[in-house]
From Swiss-Prot:
Domain of life where this protein originates: Bacteria
Upper taxonomic lineage: Bacteria, Pseudomonadati, Pseudomonadota, Gammaproteobacteria, Alteromonadales
CDD domains (alphabetical): THZ_kinase
Cofactor(s) listed: Mg(2+)
Known pathway: Cofactor biosynthesis; thiamine diphosphate biosynthesis; 4-methyl-5-(2-phosphoethyl)-thiazole from 5-(2-hydroxyethyl)-4-methylthiazole: step 1/1
Protein name: Hydroxyethylthiazole kinase
Organism, scientific name: Psychromonas ingrahamii (strain DSM 17664 / CCUG 51855 / 37)
Keywords for the protein's UniProt record, in alphabetical order: ATP-binding, Kinase, Magnesium, Metal-binding, Nucleotide-binding, Thiamine biosynthesis, Transferase
């Protein structure tokens, strides 16, 4: 067990170093609520975000970017063909697609669109809260709009089903994060109880997952670890959600190898 934990820590630390060296470009088809938060988080960590929504530029963008993040948070029927075209271009250029199925299960449109995107992607990582993961697997979860009422543990079976169905990695985010891959599952116990009170925190995790995928860490582990540790550090310096939002950017920017290793809680 310790050997596996040590190996995972090395993977996380190495991925962060590589990301900061390479500064990968990440194409984000994101939502209006999350765009500013996710772009700033990517910049703070060392990646380069571009918020691209036009079909007319998507083929070109995916030819030189490192990964594609598709976030359905403010879904509109006009966006769906663009999202699917972007996934098609990512497939052509062998780029990883990170799907954030925001509110999957809250409406039939969100659920059907999430299924379409998951089925279309060749190299896929799914990042969602427990209720979204459960709904994406075709089960009935408990949600309140885009917020999960299910525990991360309750979604493990659904995550394994998605992993096997789409040959992908699945990140379940919540009070406890789980990474589910062909190699098994990893549990992360970092983060802070204040984090859910800042909008787009999950969207930020999806964006960071795309950045790490662009440099070869294609499980979501490094992104979840880095955001969890940075969230803890930021919360210690914050009086509430407003200051947490700002302090998180500083924590991502300042996060170093020693602090990351010291604070990681993996099992």
């Amino acid at each position: 067990m310790k050997k596996n934990i040590d190996s995972n820590i090395k993977t996380i630390v190495s991925a962060l170093k590589t990301l900061r060296e390479q500064k990968p470009l990440v194409v984000n088809i994101s939502n209006y609520v999350a765009m500013n938060n996710t772009a700033n988080a990517l910049l703070a960590l060392g990646a380069s975000p571009i918020m691209a929504h036009s079909r007319d530029e998507m083929a070109e963008m995916l030819s030189f970017s490192g990964a594609l993040v598709v976030n359905i948070g403010t879904l509109d029927s006009l966006w769906i063909p663009r999202m699917l075209f972007a996934v098609e271009q990512a497939n052509i250029h062998k780029k990883t697609v990170v799907l954030d199925p925001v509110g999957c299960g809250a409406s039939s449109l969100r659920t059907a669109t999430s299924w379409q995107i998951a089925e279309a992607a060749n190299k896929l990582i799914i990042r969602g809260n427990a209720s979204e993961i459960i709904a994406l697997a075709g089960e009935k979860g408990q949600s309140k709009g885009v917020d999960s009422l299910d525990s991360s543990e309750a979604a493990l079976g659904a995550a394994r089903y998605l992993r096997d169905t789409y040959q992908c990695a699945v990140v379940i985010s919540g009070a406890t994060d789980f990474i589910v891959t062909a190699g098994g599952q990893i549990q992360l116990n970092n983060g802070h109880a204040m984090m859910p009170y800042v909008t787009a925190m999950g969207c930020t995790l999806s964006a960071l997952t795309g950045a790490f995928a662009a440099v070869g860490e294609e499980t979501g582990l490094a992104a979840a670890a880095v955001l969890g540790v940075a969230g803890e550090i930021a919360a210690e310096q914050s009086k509430g959600p407003g200051s947490l939002q700002l302090n998180l950017l500083d924590a991502l920017y300042q996060l170093d190898e020693a602090t990351l290793i010291q604070r990681l809680k993996l099992s």
